[in-house]
A protein has these predicted regions:
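Short, flexible/disordered intra-domain loops and linkers
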Residues: 16, 109-117
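Residue-level recognition of well-ordered beta-strand positions that form the cores
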Residues: 80-82, 99-103, 160-164
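Acidic-leaning, charged glycine-interspersed low-complexity segments
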Residues: 116-171
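Short, cationic low-complexity segments
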Residues: 128-129, 177-181
Length: 181
């Protein structure tokens, strides 16, 4: 396979069910960058809200890790997925979690337009966007909403959404065709 074919195959993981982590994170990314209220509430000094895709990798991170050294106060929405524990006597379904860690710089913790703590506002907007939806094929619902403190500079909130979803029962089409089954 050529380098371009390999790249195309890797990019295709964003569109197909073969890898739940990549597929779910792509849906989350699209929902976040297309929600102007979330983008504006992140209050970025260096990015233009009219170019929300630029927020990916800067304020929207598909993992829980914030950059240790910064010149300006920043607010983050970190998201991740987790799939575990097959329900008892059911090998077809598994439990899935979508985890949001909202981390806000203490220097700009209050949203000046609303007077609401920024991490609470972002949590409410994320809940509105994802709770009780079927965005991932099966309904997700919020099961945990807890405050967190990262250090003396950041505070935040962790949201966990859960669902029961099919347990990797889809095989990549090329594998099915090559093996004949």
């Amino acid at each position: 396979m050529s380098k371009n074919e390999n790249l195309k195959n890797n990019i295709d993981y964003k569109k197909h069910y073969e890898n739940d982590n990549i597929f779910y994170k792509e849906i989350i990314k699209e929902r976040l960058i297309n929600n102007s209220n979330i983008i504006e509430s992140l209050n970025s000094k260096e990015l233009d809200p009219e170019c929300p895709a630029d927020y990916m990798g800067e304020h929207l991170l598909p993992f829980y890790m914030i950059y240790p050294t910064q010149d300006q106060a920043k607010n983050y929405i970190c998201f991740d997925t987790s799939f575990q524990e097959i329900p008892r006597y059911n090998k077809i379904m598994k439990y899935g979690q979508i985890i949001f860690n909202i981390v806000c710089d203490i220097k700009e913790i209050y949203d000046k337009n609303t007077g609401i703590a920024r991490h609470d506002l972002l949590a409410a907007l994320i809940s509105k966007e994802f709770d009780w939806t079927n965005l991932f094929g099966m309904q997700v619902h919020l099961v945990s909403d807890k405050p967190m403190s990262v250090d003396n500079n950041y505070i935040g909130r962790t949201l966990i959404f859960e669902q029961t979803t099919p347990n990797s029962i889809i095989k990549e089409q090329k594998v099915i065709n090559k093996s004949g089954g």
